[in-house]
Structure formats: structure tokens, C-alpha cells
Swiss-Prot record:
Species of the source: Indian citrus ringspot virus (isolate Kinnow mandarin/India/K1/1996) (ICRSV)
Family: Belongs to the Tymovirales TGBp3 protein family.
Name the UniProt record assigns to this protein: Movement protein TGBp3
Keywords: Host endoplasmic reticulum, Host membrane, Membrane, Transmembrane, Transmembrane helix, Transport, Viral movement protein
Pfam families: TGBp3 (PF02495)
Compartment(s) of residence: Host endoplasmic reticulum membrane
Side of membrane Lumenal, spans: 1-6
Amino acid sequence: MHYIDWVILLTFAAALIVCLTPKPEPCIITVSGASATVSNCPNPELLTDLVKALKPAKPV
């Protein structure tokens, strides 16, 4: 096979792998008052702590 044939074959193989791998669901972060809830994440406890740390203590 020629070099260009290998390039095309590898491009199609990479595209097929990307299409067949499952896409992760987006995290849902809900902030209400002083509470924050995180759902659809692999580690929701860590993200909840992060959201609480980034949230200002007093409303501006």
C-alpha cells in the first residue's frame, strides 16, 4: 500500500474509535442559597466542596 492509503486508513480507524467510545454525561451543578448539589458526576462530593469553596460567603 502507498503512504497516502495508510494515512487514509488510519484516519478512518481513528474516526471510528472516536465515534464508538461513549461520551461522558455533563455534570449538573445546582447552587441555591448556601447549598450546592452536584449530580451526574463520577465524584460529586469533590465537586460539591469545590462549588462551596468558590461561592462567595456573602451575596454581592
